[in-house]
Amino acid sequence: MLSDNQLYEQNNKLFGKTKLFIIALFLVADSRFFYLLPLPDIFGGVASNKTFIGLVSLICFIWMALVTKKINVGKYVNLILFLYVFLFCQAFFEKYRFQYSTSSILFNLIPFLLFLMYFTINTFLDDKKSFKLFCLLCEWTTIFLSICLLLQLLVYNKMHFLFLNFTLSDWYTKYHVTASGRFAGVSEGYIRIAVLISFFNILNGSRKGKGIAISSFLLAISDIIFVDQSRVYIIQTVISLFFMYLIAKKNKINVNVILTIIIFAMLATVILIPKFNSIIDTLNNSSDGSNYARIGAIYYYLSFIGNYLFTGLGEYIPDEGTSQYYFIKGGQGIYNFDDIGIFGVLASMGILILIWYLLVIIKNFRLSFLIKDRNEKALAFGLSIMMLTGIFTASYLDRERLISLVLTMTIINFCARESNLNIHHG
């Protein structure tokens, strides 16, 4: 027979493992289990299809609430609740203004259930130990995901064969079947946060587990450079990492730090100069496809968004070929909300959510300033800078980057809460 104390310890271990499993399930579900498992069409296809992770987030939220009998709301709760109220109201507008079907509108909102994971992860992160476990889970997930994506890139470039379960754009499948691949979107959301988490653990100084952090970091960087290949994304990452390093090493400037900064600056220069030149060439070339579409989209949406200022055009994109599709996507069907940052937020969700988005960024920085732990402050600022630098090109309200926003809110909230607890306990 087990004593009461032994039963209590046994239940505690089971309780802890259950919570850990819930978080692990969420992390691997974002990439649809590293894109290895074939899922029904409703959940599969392009990497930006976040229907599956939305439903998993709902399940994880309910499961965590049942297991813990509580939910920690944190410092972003009012912003998240406002977003949900807005989406509910916007759904009514879409229904009666554009005559979309109720099922289409509601189905399109499923990815936003991902914000429930803010509460779920907050409930899991109740102390420093749980945060270390969370970071370790992120690192292992990053290692497996990055290896899968890098191997897929290698195989595709050599054999033009996809073994992972995501759909490539028409550029590859229809027009340039033998072209070398770049898999835009598959690394847009989770990896951009994971690379900062890995760098945070490298900066932390503890040798234990640093090998995992370094492996995760290098693989994530390789993923961003070789798999995603977005010039702006690479620049965002370098800037965020640079500021993280400066903040973490504040008051510790010595010869080693100066040498590291010099080496970092040299490597960054080698990486960034071609990217800057490429961006400048693109901006100067009005006939460049992506540049033409982005500038055209901004002018197009701004020309009439005043008529939809408080509601936006909505999140639902009608079927191609319909008049409503070409109204949303432009006459050529080439304009996208997710290509134009906050202009896309304004076009799709209106002025209220544009203000909401800016308030989130401001809150990120305000909370980051309050954090006392140097390395946690560096991580919080890295997350804040990553979001800020993508303001005109990569909105965190786009489907593939919703997880970036959820993890940014969650991590900054935890670090700020820990600092507040330490102040009171001190």
Model feature map: region roles:
Residues Y76-F88, F98-T123, L133-T142:
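Aromatic-anchored transmembrane helix interface
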Residues D281-M349:
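Long extracytoplasmic/lumenal interhelical loops at the membrane interface
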Residues I197-F199, F242, L379-I391, S395-G426:
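Transmembrane alpha-helices of multi-pass inner-membrane enzymes
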Residues C135, W140, G211, F242-K249, ...:
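Hydrophobic transmembrane alpha-helices and their immediate junctions
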Residues R97, S146-E188, Y325-G333:
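Membrane-interfacial helix-loop-helix modules of multi-pass inner-membrane proteins that assemble, modify
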Residues L20-V28, L218, R366-T393, T408:
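Loop-to-helix entry and N-terminal half of a specific, functionally important transmembrane alpha helix
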Residues M1-T68, F86-E94, S230, M387-T389, ...:
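N-terminal signal-anchor transmembrane segment
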Residues C135-M159, R182-Q229, I234-I247:
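Alpha-helical transmembrane segments of multi-pass inner-membrane proteins
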